[in-house]
Amino acid sequence: MDLNKYVQEVSLQDFGKEFRHVAIWNRRLRSTGGRFFPRDGHLDFNPKHLEEQGLEVFRKIVRHELCHYHLYFEKKGYRHGDRDFKELLAAVDGLRYAPQLEQATKPSLIYCCQSCGQVYQRKRRIDLKKYRCGKCRGKLTLKE
């Protein structure tokens, strides 16, 4: 899909205004569907949203970012809390929040205190020589 062309089409069809800057894919985005950069006017989009949620949801994400874009260049309130933004977003049926993506979670590590049995769940390994139980100061062990 040619992202720049698609964003231009959505802008003309849903806003009746031209998109004159650049739209690019950004695979590093994690919790957001897209970003608007007021400094140079370009838009970033997360390709994972298109892959996982489909074109209908992705179009609503594009509308959301175009609301920021058009309001900024019209010198109106373009931030999430501004009335102008909320009204335009509702008028074009854009998404307020991007849907949650499937996250490849790291396997949890479970540490257990040998003295009191307190259980700690962590994503990262800890140095068992350095750390002790926060409850009783007992020695921790990694559960398999």
Swiss-Prot record:
The active site is at residue 65. Disulfide bonds: none annotated. Transmembrane segments: none annotated. One of its GO terms (biological process) is response to stress. InterPro entries: SprT-like_domain (IPR006640), SprT_Zn_ribbon (IPR035240), Uncharacterised_SprT-like (IPR023524). Its cofactor is Zn(2+). One of its GO terms (cellular component) is cytoplasm. Residues 4-143 form the SprT-like domain. Binds 1 zinc ion. Keywords: Cytoplasm, Metal-binding, Zinc. Its main location: cytoplasm. SMART domains: SprT. One of its GO terms (molecular function) is zinc ion binding. It is found in: Cytoplasm. Zn(2+) binds at residues 64, 68. Belongs to the SprT family. NCBIfam families: PRK04351.1. This is Protein SprT-like. It comes from Streptococcus suis (strain 05ZYH33).
